[in-house]
Regions:
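Short helix-coil transition sites and intra-membrane helix breaks within transmembrane domains
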Residues: 10-20, 169-171, 197-208, 231-237
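Transmembrane helical segments that form the transport core of multi-pass membrane transport proteins
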Residues: 128-218
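Transmembrane helix-loop junctions in multipass membrane proteins, especially transporters and channels
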Residues: 29, 63, 86-98, 168-172, ...
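C-terminal transmembrane helix pair
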Residues: 35-85, 207-279
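Hydrophobic alpha-helical transmembrane segments of multi-pass membrane proteins
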Residues: 8-15, 72, 146-149, 153, ...
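Intrinsically disordered, low-complexity non-transmembrane regions of multi-pass membrane transporters
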Residues: 91-146
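Hydrophobic transmembrane alpha-helices that form the pore/transport pathway of multi-pass ion
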Residues: 1-47, 214-221
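Short, amphipathic, aromatic/basic-enriched membrane-interface segments that mark the entry/exit
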Residues: 38-44, 126-127, 195-196
Length: 279
């Protein structure tokens, strides 16, 4: 369903930040590598947080020993969710049209299967690509990077301040988390009432779920659940979602909220299974 170049987004996000993954996806869309549908699917499914941010999340809850489990579980679940979410509206209804307006045909879709020669071909292709890339591309890319950065930074600062204020000084997130308690209890998660708000606050800022439970006397399984869930939700408006809205992918606020809710509802039982197996 997705081109192999989607690995570029995942790697960019893992080593840098979700916004970098979105930027790379937007750029590949501009270069007519992705169709609009492919770009939207890649951005909303593979713009994961960086490995460094994973470390920050486990540090906040003083559970550094979980780092390996959290990273591997999140990576696996991200791919499971991607296979499901891209087949559900609104992503399934996006047009297979390139940036230049050309409709993608069946003949244009490259069907490739993994084989023992795949890695060798990938290394050869990457080496060829690097050798053909002029150094001037780094200079010509600077204006685009700066423009994209300016677009999202001001919005991020404003939204992060508002989100933190609402989380710390109002019961708003506690209220919206209440309907999730029965769902978490159905998944047999310990401390369901305590972690329920953390399942939804991540739409504002990815660190909020972990900050919500930090210092609470809850089971390690529940801590693992909250950390992994927050990282696989992908959509949070202080960075990734904001970057998507500022890109040319034309993803609207209501669409991103809907994708967040879909990802969350599907991810909860999957993450719960991982939590029960590992703990």
């Amino acid at each position: 369903k997705l081109p192999g170049q989607s690995a570029v987004t995942a790697v960019s996000a893992f080593v840098a930040a979700p916004a970098v993954g979105v930027f790379m996806t937007d750029r590949l869309y501009h270069e007519n590598v992705y169709t609009h549908k492919e770009a939207c699917c890649v951005a909303t499914n593979f713009s994961v947080v960086s490995l460094g941010f994973f470390a920050l999340l486990v540090t906040i809850t003083d559970t550094q020993y979980m780092y390996g489990k959290v990273v591997i579980s999140s990576l696996v679940i991200v791919f499971i969710l991607a296979a499901i979410v891209i087949r559900i509206p609104p992503l399934s209804r996006k047009k297979d049209r390139y940036y230049n307006g050309v409709e993608q045909t069946a003949a244009m879709r490259k069907s490739s299967k993994y084989s023992k020669d795949t890695m060798k071909k990938a290394v050869a292709a990457s080496t060829t690509k690097v050798s053909q890339t002029p150094y001037s591309i780094f200079v010509t890319s600077i204006p685009g990077v700066l423009s994209f950065t300016v677009k999202i930074v001001t919005f991020v600062q404003a939204l992060a301040t508002i989100a933190l204020f609402i989380s710390n000084y109002t019961p708003f997130f506690d209220w919206i988390g209440m309907p999730m308690v029965p769902y978490l209890e159905l998944c047999q998660m310990p401390d369901a009432a305590a972690i329920a708000p953390a399942t939804l606050v991540g739409i504002a800022e990815i660190a909020l779920p972990v900050m919500t439970i930090a210092g609470m006397n809850i089971a390690p399984m529940s801590i693992f659940f909250v950390i992994v869930l927050s990282t696989v939700q992908i959509i949070f408006f202080t960075e990734s979602a904001n970057a998507m809205m500022q890109s040319d992918l034309n993803l609207k606020f209501p669409e991103l909220v809907l994708i967040f809710l879909i990802r969350t509802l599907i991810a909860i039982p999957i993450v719960a299974v991982f939590a029960h197996v590992l703990f």
